[in-house]
């Protein structure tokens, strides 16, 4: 690597550290010619697929747009920054793992909805309303009812319900 101070070709690594998330290596280097020290960052370069828009246009994947989508959906919601970042990373990971050169914007939207659903149901419905082009209140109601039907019942709830039914003289559902 060239020294940024004297442009000499020979530098040596004197220290290397891996970032907390394991995706970056920080290397401390020293120039063999002038003795100056500088740091470099080494990251994995993985090409993300090109996004094919609904109108047929193509554009490079932009993680900032993805983050903006999450931020808008979760605006003023009690979701930590770390959770949002993890959701963005999960979507990017899905795109990388697809192995495809192109991916439709609808699929990206589906990945976002999966992550939003895990984070915050209000944010999920906000995003779904734009993503699925809700036309009226009935569309909102339908999505909310679908979400409620698919929500898991707490593991402690069923035994309590069965016990209450048995106390009332009605057999439980076993």
UniProtKB/Swiss-Prot annotation:
Any single biological process term in GO: negative regulation of DNA-templated transcription
Cofactor annotation: Zn(2+)
Record keywords, A-Z: ATP-binding, DNA-binding, Metal-binding, Nucleotide-binding, Repressor, Transcription, Transcription regulation, Zinc, Zinc-finger
Domain ATP-cone positions: 49-139
Entry's cofactor comment: Binds 1 zinc ion.
Keyword DNA-binding: yes
Any GO MF annotation of the entry: ATP binding
Zinc finger intervals, unnamed: 3-34
Family matches, as InterPro entries: ATP-cone_dom, NrdR-like_N, RNR_NrdR-like
Any Pfam family the entry gives: Zn_ribbon_NrdR
Family to which this protein belongs: Belongs to the NrdR family.
Function description: Negatively regulates transcription of bacterial ribonucleotide reductase nrd genes and operons by binding to NrdR-boxes.
HAMAP family linked to this entry: NrdR
Protein name: Transcriptional repressor NrdR
Species whose genome carries this gene: Xanthomonas euvesicatoria pv. vesicatoria (strain 85-10) (Xanthomonas campestris pv. vesicatoria)
